[in-house]
Amino acid sequence: MMKVLVVVALLVTLISYSSSEGIDDLEADELLSLMANEQTRKECIPKHHECTSDKHGCCRGNFFKYKCQCTTVVTQDGEQTERCFCGTPPHHKAAELVVGFGKKIFG
């Protein structure tokens, strides 16, 4: 039973990994922004750094590319602004945990 769970976890990890290789659902304006930023970008944005101006410029982690995660910040004046940072989505963290656990068990 344990082997079946490990195999299923590895399959989920591989499917998730292959889906992270492609570009996520882009709208037309995001695609134009991506093309413009791709020409001027020289380095990727590291984990936990701000990616508000370049949402597709995050670096690659151990297994997956970091995703630009955004939140809305409200200032004391009541003005709302969007702030984004490169981070690991929860489902990628879970996949990395399963792979790490599998490496410990099977060496």
Curated annotation (Swiss-Prot):
Belongs to the neurotoxin 19 (CSTX) family. 04 (U1-Lctx) subfamily. The keyword Transcription does not apply. It comes from Lycosa singoriensis (Wolf spider). Expressed by the venom gland. Residues 1-20 form the signal peptide. One of its GO terms (cellular component) is extracellular region. Residues 21-41 form a propeptide. This is U1-lycotoxin-Ls1t. One of its GO terms (molecular function) is toxin activity. Keywords: Disulfide bond, Knottin, Secreted, Signal, Toxin. Disulfide bonds join 44-59, 51-68, 58-86, 70-84. InterPro entries: Spider_toxin_CSTX_knottin (IPR019553), Spider_toxin_CSTX_Knottin_CS (IPR011142). The keyword Signal applies. The presence of a 'disulfide through disulfide knot' structurally defines this protein as a knottin. It is found in: Secreted. Pfam families: Toxin_35 (PF10530).
